A protein has these predicted regions:
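Sigma70-family region 2
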Residues: 40-56, 70-79, 138, 186-190
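Arg/Lys-rich amphipathic alpha helix in sigma70-family domain 2
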Residues: 65-83, 90-98, 185
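Hydrophobic positions on the alpha-helical face of helix-turn-helix-like DNA-binding modules
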Residues: 39, 63, 132, 148, ...
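Solvent-exposed, charged amphipathic helical/linker segments at domain boundaries
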Residues: 158-164, 169-255, 259-261
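Amphipathic alpha-helical segment used for protein-protein interaction
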Residues: 2, 101-144, 198-202, 206, ...
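Short amphipathic alpha helix immediately N-terminal
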Residues: 138-157
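Structural recognition of an alpha-helix C-terminal capping motif at a helix-to-coil junction
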Residues: 34-41, 54-66
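A short, charge-rich alpha-helical start-of-domain segment used by transcription regulators
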Residues: 1-20, 30-36
Length: 316
């Protein structure tokens, strides 16, 4: 009989990084949580046969990766609006909601960052979590995705990946080359990435929050990069250009100061805000922010996400 306390002691420390791994694979926080639960259940059932020939961490990653690969056989690719069509040039048209599409979800940093305050550990946890990376990886076939994440993000040796996937080292290297070739053909949003705690970035974020809270469209226009992008899943349309984005916001958002409140949080290793309208949860804004302005806004219009960020549904 396996001792449940012993099992918990040996596996609990890996839960957060396994959640990050499963999320990178499937692009959904909800599905990643389910897959971590499945991983732990499978590990519990097989724990009595674990001989320690591989480390506990490697063993759990093998179980988690195989669980993800099995799940991806029966699921559709997670996407952002920019992965479906070109940008819209009409920000004043009524939005087209597409709740049937499996949208990419944001990962709250609080769910995956290590409980220790070690800066190096926190930076390592953020690696490979950028929303743009997660979105583009979803274009890869599942096994290419797994190899790329294990090799390029987690820095596993080719021999370790080969053992996990039960293939040859040659097959791993070939799969990684095909993944890189596929990614080179895909557009990847890039910016001068800065840490969210950079003082210049913090100042940009303060101005962003103030612009919404004060309904200051002029300030927002100045803050957004000229070619900034805004996406709003589950709305299919997305917009490029600061002037179009501000027209969109002026058309669809409250226009009186004090009607919007912004609460700082973080997602995918990026700065984010809980966006409240008249005190009620509305959306999560995940930002690509640079010291000189906002490059991209992904506004997830789903108040159900707030709980995962430890944010209240209401500020009233």
């Amino acid at each position: 009989m396996v001792d449940i306390d012993e099992f918990a002691v040996h596996t609990a420390q890996y839960r957060r990084e396994l959640l990050a791994h499963c999320y990178r694979m499937v692009g959904s926080v909800d599905d990643a949580e389910d897959l971590v639960q499945e991983t732990m259940l499978r590990a519990w059932r097989a724990y009595g046969d674990f001989e320690g020939r591989a480390s506990m961490r490697t063993w759990l990653y093998r179980i988690a990766t195989n669980a993800c690969l099995n799940a991806l056989q029966h699921s559709s690719r997670r996407v952002l609006p920019s992965g479906l069509s070109g940008p819209s040039d009409d920000p004043e048209t009524a939005p087209f909601l597409s709740n049937e599409i499996p949208w990419l979800q944001p990962m709250p940093d609080v769910r995956i960052e290590p409980e220790s305050s070690d800066p190096a550990a926190i930076v390592a946890a953020r690696e490979g979590m950028r929303l743009a990376l997660i979105a583009v990886w979803q274009y890869l076939p599942p096994r290419q995705r797994a190899v790329l994440i294990l090799r390029d993000v987690l820095r596993w040796k080719a021999s370790e990946v080969a053992e996990l996937l039960e293939v040859s080292v040659t097959a791993v290297n070939s799969t990684l080359q095909r993944a890189h070739a596929t990614l080179r053909q895909l557009p990847l949003a890039t910016a001068d990435i800065a840490e969210p705690d950079d003082p210049a970035v913090r100042a940009v974020l303060d101005r962003y929050a103030a612009a919404f809270e004060n309904a200051d469209m002029a300030a927002l226009t100045e803050l957004l990069k000229t070619d900034a992008v805004m996406e709003m899943p589950p709305i299919r349309e997305w917009f490029r250009g600061n002037l179009r984005i501000v027209r969109l916001i002026a058309t669809r958002c409250p226009t009186r100061a004090g009607e919007v409140q912004m609460v700082r949080t973080a997602a995918n290793g990026q700065p984010a805000f809980g966006f409240y309208v008249r005190g009620e949860a509305h959306s999560i804004h995940v930002l690509t922010a640079t010291p000189t302005g906002i490059e991209r806004i992904v506004s997830f219009h789903d108040s159900g996400l707030f709980e995962g960020f430890d944010l209240p549904k209401s500020l009233l």
